[in-house]
């Protein structure tokens, strides 16, 4: 189940510390789609520079033709107008063990949405889907996130969703080998991944 705004998160070589993101926009702005990455993270409103970790960014139209993208400032880009869907491919360098950014190596992956998910300007209120792909060469990793599952099995890779961009960036993702437990405290269900 893919939304009109769909993100695919993958990594060919986790030890490279790079997430590969494919963003597909079914109905981009006919004047040229703007994309942006927040300079803040929910719960920590210091100005941050997450966009500095985007190492490559390119786009293609539905026929596979290159679409020109230009930087507008340090955290936003504009793609040339296209007819039909727009696909944006980019890499994010993930080598920050803090809880605010992203980290990826051969042992685990972690990210906050503010570090990985470019916002689609003018469509932030739209529902989104996210396909989390198991990194190549990995066989026993699981996924811990509060993102609502669409087709993913519990603790599994697959498709997740969010009602809008704000909801998307409010759900961190951890992937790797971990112990998982569920319990109830004061009538409230809890889950923990360690």
Predicted regions and their residues:
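Early extracytoplasmic/domain-onset interaction patches
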Residues: 1-39
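Short amphipathic, basic-aromatic surface patches that mediate peripheral association
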Residues: 39-45
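Non-catalytic architectural context of zinc metalloproteases
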Residues: 47-56, 60-194
